[in-house]
Design a protein with these regions (language model features):
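All-alpha amphipathic helical-bundle segments outside canonical DNA-binding/catalytic cores
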Residues: 39, 78-82, 99-115
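Internal catalytic or translocation cores that form aromatic/hydrophobic pockets or channels
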Residues: 65-69, 73, 77-93
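Alpha-helical structural segments
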Residues: 10-33, 39, 43-50, 61, ...
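Amphipathic alpha-helical segments used for helix-helix packing
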Residues: 54-74, 127-134
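C-terminal peripheral helix-coil segments that are non-catalytic and often amphipathic
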Residues: 47-54, 84-100, 115-161
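Short hydrophobic/aromatic patch on the recognition helix
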Residues: 1-5
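Alpha-helical structural elements of signaling/regulatory helical domains
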Residues: 7, 33-36, 54-57, 71, ...
Length: 161
């Protein structure tokens, strides 16, 4: 490990870069600029939902990184740079939605990203405790589809408010 990465900390930074790189690279392939604003938001929400649902290890590692106050993310310019792509894409969607009268003015793309990520991330990061406490199977197909639709609806209602 030390031969290739120098330290276990650097290995961890590279794992984070790989995981964040995977989501950011795939987001850039969604062709959001080619879609109408409402459809683009649907695609972002559905992609984020499915990505988190299918990449539980990503969610776990992000949770662990937050326990450590983001110390390893701070070591990576790559993660920050690649993460700007989704913010620019959301900024473009918001601008087009405002211009067409579909979305209200004044929504910040980082706030929108936080909202989408929060809804999609929480149901995975807390799935065991939430499922047990409220006796719901968050991993059932019926519940997943219901939650995906609910999140799309909530985000779009926020944008149209």
């Amino acid at each position: 490990i030390y031969y290739y990465f120098g330290s276990k900390e650097q290995l961890y930074v590279e794992v984070l870069e790989k995981l964040y790189g995977d989501i950011r690279n795939t987001e850039s392939e969604l062709n959001l600029g080619e879609l109408e604003p409402v459809e683009a938001i649907h695609r972002v929400v559905e992609f984020t939902f499915d990505h988190h649902d299918n990449n539980v290890d990503f969610v776990r590692i992000v949770c662990i990184e937050n326990i450590h106050n983001g110390e390893n993310v701070k070591q990576s310019d790559t993660i920050q740079a690649k993460s700007q792509n989704i913010i620019r894409a959301l900024e473009d969607i918001l601008r087009r939605g405002e211009e067409s009268g579909e979305f209200r003015a004044g929504v910040h793309p980082i706030d929108l990203h936080l909202m989408i990520s929060s809804f999609c991330f929480y149901r995975i990061s807390n799935r065991h405790t939430f499922s047990e406490i409220f006796q719901i199977e968050l991993w059932s197909d019926e519940v997943k589809q219901r939650h995906k639709a609910m999140i799309c609806d909530a985000v779009l209602r926020y944008l149209k408010a």
